[in-house]
Swiss-Prot record:
Record GO biological process: proton motive force-driven ATP synthesis
Database matches in Pfam families: ATP-synt_8
Segments crossing the lipid bilayer: 4-24
Origin species: Aedes albopictus
Entry keywords, A to Z: ATP synthesis, CF(0), Hydrogen ion transport, Ion transport, Membrane, Mitochondrion, Transmembrane, Transmembrane helix, Transport
Organismal lineage: Eukaryota, Metazoa, Ecdysozoa, Arthropoda, Hexapoda
Assembly behavior: F-type ATPases have 2 components, CF(1) - the catalytic core - and CF(0) - the membrane proton channel.
Protein name as it appears in the record: ATP synthase protein 8
Protein purpose: Mitochondrial membrane ATP synthase (F(1)F(0) ATP synthase or Complex V) produces ATP from ADP in the presence of a proton gradient across the membrane which is generated by electron transport complexes of the respiratory chain. F-type ATPases consist of two structural domains, F(1) - containing the extramembraneous catalytic core and F(0) - containing the membrane proton channel, linked together by a central stalk and a peripheral stalk. During catalysis, ATP synthesis in the catalytic domain of F(1) is coupled via a rotary mechanism of the central stalk subunits to proton translocation.
Topology within the bilayer: Single-pass membrane protein
Amino acid sequence: MPQMAPISWLTLFFIFSITLVIFNMKNYFCFFYNSNESCQNLNIKQYKLNWKW
């Protein structure tokens, strides 16, 4: 069974690492969250508390 040179392991490591980083960046920056619309549809009562110590 042939053995791989250390430079081949390094190139594989860098390729998979860069692929992982690009995939995570794509998923992180392509997700759009509309918080204003979802908060306006829900009628949540907010209570203000004045704490006096």
